[in-house]
Amino acid sequence: MNTKVSRQYAKISENSIQKISLALATPEDVLEWSRGEVHRPETINYKTFKPERGGLFDELIFGPLVDYKCSVCGRKYRKSNENQLCIATKECKIRGSRILSKMARRYSMGHIALNAPILHFWFFKIDHSIIAKLLGLKVFEGNSKVPTTITKAAIENLIYYKSHIVLETGGLKSLEQNKIIDISEAGLIYKNALIEIIEFYPPGSEEHNALAESISELADVTSSKIGREYGVDYYELNEIIEEFSSARIATGALAIEYLLDKIDLRAEKAAVEAELAGVQKQIYKNKKIILKNQKRDKLYKRLQVINAFINSGQDPKMMIIRNLPVIPADLRPLVQLDGSRHSTSDCNELYRRIIIRNNRLKRWKAAHAPVIIIQNEMRMLQEAVDALIDNQKKSTNQVTTKEGRPLKSISDALTGKKGRFRQNLLGKRVDYSGRSVIVVGPKLKMHQAGLPRKMAAVLFEPWIIRNLIQEKKVGSIKMARKMIEEENPIIWPHVAKVIQNKPIILNRAPTLHRLSIQAFEPVLVRAKAIQLHPLVTAGFNADFDGDQMAVHIPISPEAIRETQELMFADKNILGPKDGEPIVNPSQDMVLGLYYLSQEKAGAKGEGSFFSTYEAMLKAYEFRSVELHARVVLPFEQVKPFIAKTMRGHLISTVGKFILNNIFPANFPFIFDDNVDELELNYPSQIKKYVLPYGTNFREYIQNLKVNEPLNKKAIAKIVRQIFDTYDGLLAKEDIATVIDQLDFGNYQNCVLRYEKLRDYKKQKLPVPHLSKLSEFTIFEYSQLYKQLQQNGPVESYRVLEDHEKAELLEKIWFKYNNMVCSILDKIKDLGFHYSTLSGTSIAISDIKMAPKKHEFIKEGENYINKLNTFYAKGLITDDERYVLAIAKWTQIKNDIQEDLNQSIKDDNQNSLVMMMKSGARGNISNFVQLAGMRGLMANNVKALKVDAENERVVRSIVEVPVKSSFLEGLTSFEFYSSTHGARKGLTDTALNTAKSGYLTRRLVDVAQNIVVVAEDCFSDFGFVVKDIIDTKTNTIIVPLLERIEGRFLNKDVYDSRGIKLASAGTMVDLQTAKKIVAAGIKKVEIRSILSCHIKNSVCKKCYGKDLATNRLVSIGEAVGIIAAQSIGEPGTQLTMRTFHTGGVANVEDITGGFTRLIELIDSHEHPWGKPAKISPYYGIITKISDLAEKNAANKGFLITIEYKTSKNEKAEHIIRIEQSQKLRVKVGDKVIPGQKLVEGPIILKELLAVSDARTLQNYLLKEIQRIYRMQGISISDKYIEIIIRQMLSKVQIIENGDSNFFIGSIVDISDYQEVNGQLISQNKNPAFGNVIVKGAKQIPLLSNSFLAAASYQETSKILVHSVISSQIDKLEGLKENIIVGHKIPAGTNSNYEPKSKFDIRNPLSFFMKNNR
């Protein structure tokens, strides 16, 4: 049942909330919320420290300080008496004391009955004054026929009693309607008004004499010094004018209230729409009228405010406060410090000022004080209420502490990082959590983490206490708690017992992406540090140099199940960013595997034959054969599966036999570092290493080429292929169906039942999966059989209990899903073991000097001397000399690097070289600095925008390089230069991290509500993709293969012979993608997020493959957040140095790096550098001529484009280009709208204006991809598409037709299409609008959810507009549901499909009788 609840919010459950709406609170609403009036400014009694009656902490109003204690007589009650009235004494009955818990102090409100109407600060200060827009006051000054609009500042002066306004002219010509009377012109205006009024009365009459006297007094005052300085007495004159005429002049909130009461909103709307139509016509006639555009924008905003009040049906007078709510006492606490001192919330001081001024005003009114004193008190009261509402926004008279700090008002408590939204609603402190330093846990399994037992004892305390009491180790909770605190040895077995099947969640800050939070099975360790598996560190971006991690405990059964099924480390093998494994071995492990897989010609024991693998190991242990020696084993000993088809002996090193032994029997044998597509290349590769019986082994091996060992990249490829081969293909439900059919008599034949199952692609299970599943099933059944036999004989046909089946299912399911991780664990163990055995250590003698270094340095110095000579002769400029010098030293360093590369090419025993070649640590660049030269250093120069626009050389690199290497040692200048450069790197990184974090936050807000919600949206619009090519360098940025793999086709794909390669509606897998590219196809039309028809969400087919699971995305996946994290997480790696070449600020520099990314995502109107000129038409370049002007600085070109008009007539368009801009076109070139004519960044709004949304989408996608790919970071297109879709998701209405939209409003594109569809179906006029591009900063503010928008930025502005329009938040997105305490509408709380990753039912449910 849907019930509208608008009062007593504390009494409803947050789970029952379906919608939230904001509205203006009426004085009656405030009285209904309130439990009493606060009329005294006191807080607590200074002697007793008890709250004062009628004060800001009154227990009768705000609730008791002690649970269920009467606030009047002090009598204590039970919880069962809650909400009853205390009747213990007569005073209790009179005061109506209610029995409540102290929690009431968090939601019980009071009120202050104001003795004067006060205008709510937000409505005249936020967003250029809502009141000014609503009233739209205009006045005809003198004889002018064009009215002057009264400004926001003039209305503020009116509110603060600094000026008066003519509310009614009373037929007086000297008074203009809405005229603001300032102190400077008051004397003249009042004089003219009185002269006009006196004419209505006959001379000699009482009225005439009184008016004549007033005119005489006014003349005396205005001519006197006091009158000129302090002005006239407004109030006396106003009374005279109102007494003798029907004119009315007023000031303050009363004047505004009068104006709001008189306004006719519908008439105002009609007038504004008529004026808007006139302005629109003028703009269409002449598009260059900038002032008219500004006027139109002002009218749009005014219309928006008027429409808000009309549609919400609210009375604008409710913007005036008569009863001021007082927030609950516990939300503005008074805390006792040491001794008798107290610390209080700033709000209490602000409330106190209001009460004091309000009470004083009441006394002045009662004493009939002069009007001027009362008006002054009302102004002070207005200022006091303003300070309470929003002290920071007050331009003057901010209320400050003694130290000068502005007090925090209610608005400040909402906004910013420390405000209610971000500090208390979106981010909360979590109980059952702890943190500690992390250390490596090399012996852990991948799903395990080492938890210090002291932490476990505290985190799992309630369970341990229950266990101790159940087993009668203690008699009470208190004793158990004491035992845990004292760390009594009795507790440790119970701690170990309690943590079974209780996963823990580890989080490392900064949580940049979802791999920063993963779940593990806890393993108790005696140390105080958390042990972390070495392979998962990459996901957390953790190292062991003092990093700390937080631990959290999921408590409810649902949370535990979700943690185990979705968050365990074995479910997070692929990185969501690019779909590549993130658990690749690194450092020690890589070094160990590199050492293990090395081959050495002529090593001890080479050519030896061993009949078994164990015999080979024994020989290696007895040192009769070396690890790197190539030996021979019978084929069936190594690969028994293939031995049936291939006979003979296999050649490899001892190390490689050991390495291959850890892989499953049906995984291809790894012979060398050529590990691409092992399955496909296996038959051709294996022939070289298989010897028929009777071959001379030693002779054959001597002629065999020595293979390269496995480096980091090769190992990563192997890991990927392990994942592709052994990642689970079945759902839990499938395995449950098999278990349900098995008993102790037939479990040995389980493989027959598994053969009948089909994987998620509807295909038969591969042999590796069948063999492993049957192996796990047979093992678990036999274990259970043995266990049951201990209690007596077990019949083979015995039917298993449901709980036994569920237990079997859990064990088999875990092993099946853990296949990849178990192999990775073996790789890890092997890597660590052999890196230790390799004995790798480094000495200074390992660094080999570059042989030709000094020759290259000499060459560079000679070149620089020549440059200096040319410069001295005036043949080159200083800038040219600098650029050439930098280029030369860069080339010299590259030459030294190449020379070093050649010298260490065959040095495989050098430890440093081994580390570098294997990819364990360091690269050739580090080696060059050690053994060659350090090279050029960064210079800390501020690059200005004007430098980029004028293409000046920015000297961001020190001209003199560091010629020494670290081996030789640096001179004092070189040392200084080095530290200077290093420091710049550190500061850049620190600044970059903060900017990157802010970018991620904005992106999350942009895309947070995008969730996969449907199977198919049936869109027939596609998105044509091709290689993304950098047109400047003509290099491929993103190949077609990457862009189509994992996406659905929108149209059939045919090769040049007309043979169909793939059908529309099918997902392109890697093999199909390779086939399409091999056929020479350049363009493919795919389903895209940019064309998806689902409102604010996306369907499975438009999204395609989930990169984190390597299969089709599941319904419920929060792809918007994944996209934001994937783009934001590598942001820190993007360089912030705009001019990283140190040369001329050319286009390549300007368009690279973090700065350019921010420009694109925020849709900057003034990008860094000189913007590119673009073609506005389809046409041909007919002429490029020099622009000859007298002023040499204005030289440039004129590009003439010939195009056809709508009437098919030829026309010319001339574009002026500055001389410094580089042309990208020549005469005769065909151009299309949006095409660059010169180098430089394109302004997004301009591109959208001359082309269409699809062109802009392609441009953004290409530019963002280029920025990341230049840094070697690969991000999937689909993530960028999600952000681009949001950037282009709004339409600005230019004609409203028969719709309810108003001209100038910005609406969601899906709402626009929906409304227009309905209008067209009813034969009505549709609305017309233009798609607009908005940056990531503005999109969240335009959200349909005011909660999501207000929690992002500009909180007060969002709330003001939501209040006046009475906006309804339907709680559709993720943020708004978190704010109200709901589960998010994604993942396990979405309408997921059966057998999907989010279908995490209790295993028992698969075997329940009613489930069959």
Curated annotation (Swiss-Prot):
This is DNA-directed RNA polymerase subunit beta'. The RNAP catalytic core consists of 2 alpha, 1 beta, 1 beta' and 1 omega subunit. When a sigma factor is associated with the core the holoenzyme is formed, which can initiate transcription. GO terms for molecular function: DNA binding; DNA-directed RNA polymerase activity; magnesium ion binding; zinc ion binding. Its EC number is 2.7.7.6. The gene is rpoC. Pfam families: RNA_pol_Rpb1_1, RNA_pol_Rpb1_2, RNA_pol_Rpb1_3, RNA_pol_Rpb1_4, RNA_pol_Rpb1_5. It catalyses: RNA(n) + a ribonucleoside 5'-triphosphate = RNA(n+1) + diphosphate. Mg(2+) binds at residues 543, 545, 547. GO terms for biological process: DNA-templated transcription. Its cofactor is Mg(2+); Zn(2+). InterPro entries: DNA-dir_RpoC_beta_prime (IPR045867), DNA-dir_RpoC_beta_prime_bact (IPR012754), RNA_pol_asu (IPR000722), RNA_pol_N (IPR006592), RNA_pol_Rpb1_1 (IPR007080), RNA_pol_Rpb1_3 (IPR007066), RNA_pol_Rpb1_3_sf (IPR042102), RNA_pol_Rpb1_4 (IPR007083). One of its GO terms (cellular component) is DNA-directed RNA polymerase complex. SMART domains: RPOLA_N (SM00663). Zn(2+) binds at residues 1017, 1092, 1099, 1102. DNA-dependent RNA polymerase catalyzes the transcription of DNA into RNA using the four ribonucleoside triphosphates as substrates. Binds 1 Mg(2+) ion per subunit. Keywords: DNA-directed RNA polymerase, Magnesium, Metal-binding, Nucleotidyltransferase, Transcription, Transferase, Zinc. PANTHER family: DNA-DIRECTED RNA POLYMERASE, DNA-DIRECTED RNA POLYMERASE SUBUNIT BETA. It comes from the Bacteria.
